[in-house]
Amino acid sequence: MRRRVASNLLWMLADRGLQVVVGIGVVAMLARALGTEGFAHFQYAQSLVFIAASIPLICSAEVVVPRLVARPAPEAAHALLAHAYAIRMTAGIAGYAMMCAYLAFTQQPADTWIPAAILGTAIMLREPFGVVIAWMQARTHNRPNVVFNLVAMAAKVALIGALFFTGVNLVPAYATAFAIEPLIAAALLAWYYLSRAPRTVPSRDASLTRDLVRDGTLFWVSFMLMVCARRADQLILKPLVPLAELGAYAATMQVLDNFTTIATILAAGIAPMYVFGQKSAEAARRNVLRVAGGMTAIGLCGALILALSAEWVVALLYGQAFGETVVLLRLAALASTLVFADVGLSLLPVFLRKPRWVAMKWALVLTTTVIVDLIAVPRLGTRGAVLGYAVGNAVALILGLVLALRARTATAIASA
């Protein structure tokens, strides 16, 4: 079992590692081609898409993967995935429509709404077709997804490189290149699963749909709150700081997003066997604490390296125009260690089927982040947003530890 988990993790980490390495070149070209203001418009559009993309998460992997592990029969898994896909696609279309409505209502400039409309097509692709990734995770076999990601990423990089070296500096052109990636990945995922799935078309099961929506709703609310907590800073910053400073802050968060995704990959690779596969809550709790401890150590080591090499990273990625990003990255990198610990601890409420707790946690994190940002940003500018990022992550970690302690107490009482 350990060898299988280790092999799966290596493939997932290799996938993310290659994405980060290639992302260095992509970000370097993007920042240099668009400049600080154009880069700020692009990142703001991505933030809007990121928030809207949380809507299809109403039937997330946290709901689908444990069910797939519990019912591995091909016909049962096929029916489950078909219903999850229908739910996600419906939500994805709604999410894209809501994003477009927001752009129209707020009368965003063309530099924002055009790239947002293009990038937003991913809302209807990533999560709906991502049910195949959940199927792979349940089988602890992520290698095909890694290959598909590489193919899609190669196409995106080729297009961006062509735009950059031909001197194109239009934000919509680069947004189109980014939108190609999820389209190719979705097509490959659909081909891979359908070539191996049962040939029968699952009949519509209203009770299964209700169960998936009901069980996924609180996790979905928590994801929505989490996404808002992660992107509220940029929405608050835009009217309060110059566009160039917003670009510097967005550059910092982009580096950290790439870095902290490693935590999600580690958790996704370990959870099916070491957490979701446990028979007792106490065994799962112990494993979650071990996972969280190991992930914290990895996060701390990575954060220290990132902070020490911040000047070199910024110069390589963004160039001299993003000098303010160096200080922001050093401060935020150290705070990102808390993200690794929180992601590990978040496996426990998923195992215990306590989405209400997750939703409450992220509601408090969002509230804390917004309050700190509204107080600190007018006084400290982008550094105030970094403070909000750190305090919000600390609140998430504390609440995760509280749940782990409560779970231990409840287990002790039940066994007494």
Functional labels for PLM-detected ranges:
Residues 1-5, 143, 171-177, 187-230, ...:
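Interhelical loop/hinge segments that connect adjacent transmembrane helices in multipass membrane
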Residues 3-61, 214-243, 369-370, 389, ...:
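Signature of the first transmembrane helix
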Residues 7-23, 45, 49-50, 54-103, ...:
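Membrane-water interface segments that mark the loop-to-transmembrane alpha-helix transition
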Residues 23, 56-73, 138, 256-281, ...:
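Helix-loop junctions and terminal segments of transmembrane helices
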Residues 36-40, 103-119, 243, 307-340, ...:
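Interfacial segments at transmembrane-helix termini and the short loops linking adjacent helices
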Residues 42, 46-54, 226, 249-268, ...:
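Transmembrane helix-bundle signature of multi-pass secondary active exporters and lipid flippases
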Residues 113-120, 146-197, 364-368, 382-406:
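Hydrophobic alpha-helical transmembrane segments
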Residues 125-149, 334-361:
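Membrane-interface junctions at transmembrane-helix termini in multi-pass inner-membrane proteins
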